[in-house]
Amino acid sequence: MKQRLVQLIAQTELQVTEQQVQQLVGYVELLHKWNKAYNLTSVRDPNEMLVKHIMDSIVVSAHLQGENFIDVGTGPGLPGIPLAIMCPEKNFTLLDSLGKRIRFIKQVVHELKIANVTPVQSRVEEFQPEQGFDGVISRAFASMNDMVSWCHHLPAENGHFLALKGQFSEQEVAELPEWCSVTEVKPLQIPELEGKRHLVILTAKK
């Protein structure tokens, strides 16, 4: 599996260390193991996880500006855990309302010695951080409108929303609230993944 991940990463411009590769593979192994009992993801095959979960997450690492990030509706830690492994100098809060997911993330953080992740069990509307985040990340929301509406209280003054999407939809943009606008759309190239992926960056209007 390690060799397969190295081959996938070689098809991108990402730079990874041996330790990062070991941690990413370790995460997939733990996810595969826990998934049998806890049903954390619909993806069952570890090789498929490498593409749909690891590569789909880590390609975003090149676009993160700032130090403090929150992954809302992280599920089993996606994209938060792979991003934290790729960006050890940044801090990631991983938010989910389901206890089994947060227990899994705590186990991952402990076993793989990931120092820059804070798992939080909470509904997003009830979570009140002491300070805002530079980036609010999610691939969990059905629409960007849902994302910015539920997470409006989370960005810092100059913070952004980072929505991981499949197709980029002008219809979704039209449905955004007036206080929010799309500042950038970045097509993401993910080796061996069928279908298009986009990172949509949204900002509150001043």
Swiss-Prot record:
E.C. designation(s): 2.1.1.170
Catalysed reactions, semicolon-separated: guanosine(527) in 16S rRNA + S-adenosyl-L-methionine = N(7)-methylguanosine(527) in 16S rRNA + S-adenosyl-L-homocysteine
Enzyme category, top tier: transferase
GO cellular component, one term: cytosol
InterPro entries reported for this sequence: rRNA_ssu_MeTfrase_G, SAM-dependent_MTases_sf
Keywords, in A-Z order: Cytoplasm, Methyltransferase, rRNA processing, S-adenosyl-L-methionine, Transferase
GO MF annotation terms: rRNA (guanine-N7-)-methyltransferase activity
Its job: Specifically methylates the N7 position of guanine in position 527 of 16S rRNA.
PANTHER family reported in the protein's UniProt record: S-ADENOSYL-L-METHIONINE-DEPENDENT METHYLTRANSFERASES SUPERFAMILY PROTEIN
Matches recorded under NCBIfam families: rsmG_gidB
Name of the protein described by the UniProt record: Ribosomal RNA small subunit methyltransferase G
Upper taxonomic lineage: Bacteria, Pseudomonadati, Pseudomonadota, Gammaproteobacteria, Vibrionales
